[in-house]
Amino acid sequence: MSNPTSTPRADGFRMPAEWEPHEQTWMVWPERPDNWRNGGKPAQAAFAAVAKAIARFEPVTVCASAGQYENARARLDDGNIRVVEISSDDAWVRDTGPTFVIDDKGDVRGVDWGFNAWGGFEGGLYFPWQRDDQVARKILEIERRARYRTDDFVLEGGSIHVDGEGTLITTEECLLNHNRNPHLSQVEIERTLRDYLAVDSIIWLPNGLYNDETDGHVDNFCCYVRPGEVLLAWTDDQDDPNYLRCQAALRVLEESRDAKGRKLVVHKMPIPGPLYATQEECDGVDIVEGSQPRDPSIRLAGSYVNFLIVNGGIVAPSFDDPKDAEARAILQRVFPEHEVVMVPGREILLGGGNIHCITQQQPAPRKA
């Protein structure tokens, strides 16, 4: 496997949009007891349901530790799901896995960003994180794909969304946070994104969703549904702490033009809840120094925007919430050619994310 010293853009590679054809989707099996309650068993059932939903549309590869391999293999009883042994610190492959890039000659490579558990020693969610920082490299080794490594640049895949036509959306709350790349200016961060993802226009939303442990990842708040159109988490409740965040994001989106000069169409997606963990759910999480404590008084950052686009389908979270039906209807309206499949997302949310956070698509090779 090669490790180019150039950049993807210089080599003719770009990050494709999520709706472009996939070869497969990657996941990592959950087991960390100080993040997933009851030894991870409820989360494992939730991850298995997500993997099987995706497997209806495309192959899935799930990475599991040596200690969990047999259990994962037994629970993932689907002919379209492969299980491979990879050690990791937790299960957020959107943030620890590679960001795949493609060219027009049929090649696929991967960007291996630096990872510091969403903030390192200044607000990070756990320590150590070395095994998570190795996940992208291991995946690229398995796939025999060239690897671009950014040793001096920290980025999580959930902090970016692209339209595949030169535009990227992110949040200032995350990418400009001093606990990610304090040695870089906004201009330098933008230059890195342009060089490694081949984007030309970057839209900066001020914040992500309220109480998002990742410092406001955009994939829990706003995403592209097609070039020129985005889906934004939304509330009309002026007493909701998300209200001002939604308003500020809408202003930026309405004032922005993408790399093709288009004015963006903004679709609104209601925010579920408010949702909270129960005391019982919190009590099921092991208490370990350096890990994120669980508190039933803290609102969960639930979002229907945290879905995955797969080949011919949309796999989205449900929350046993009155807004579930409306969310499904909106997804079906904005993705009329896709089948919408909703999978219970509460157990994933309790761990700090949702379906988009626990998946990483690998694009299929394409020739122009």
From Swiss-Prot:
HAMAP family: Agmatine_deimin (MF_01841). Its EC number is 3.5.3.12. Homodimer. Keywords: Hydrolase, Polyamine biosynthesis. This is Agmatine deiminase. The lineage of its organism: Bacteria, Pseudomonadati, Pseudomonadota, Gammaproteobacteria, Pseudomonadales. It catalyses: agmatine + H2O = N-carbamoylputrescine + NH4(+). It holds the Pfam family PAD_porph. Belongs to the agmatine deiminase family. It comes from the Bacteria. NCBIfam families: agmatine_aguA, PRK13551.1. SUPFAM superfamilies: Pentein. Mediates the hydrolysis of agmatine into N-carbamoylputrescine in the arginine decarboxylase (ADC) pathway of putrescine biosynthesis, a basic polyamine. GO terms for molecular function: agmatine deiminase activity; protein-arginine deiminase activity. Gene3D superfamilies: L-arginine/glycine Amidinotransferase, Chain A. Pathway: Amine and polyamine biosynthesis; putrescine biosynthesis via agmatine pathway; N-carbamoylputrescine from agmatine: step 1/1. The active site is at residue 357. InterPro entries: Agmatine_deiminase (IPR017754), Peptidyl-Arg-deiminase_porph (IPR007466). GO terms for biological process: putrescine biosynthetic process from arginine. Transmembrane segments: none annotated.
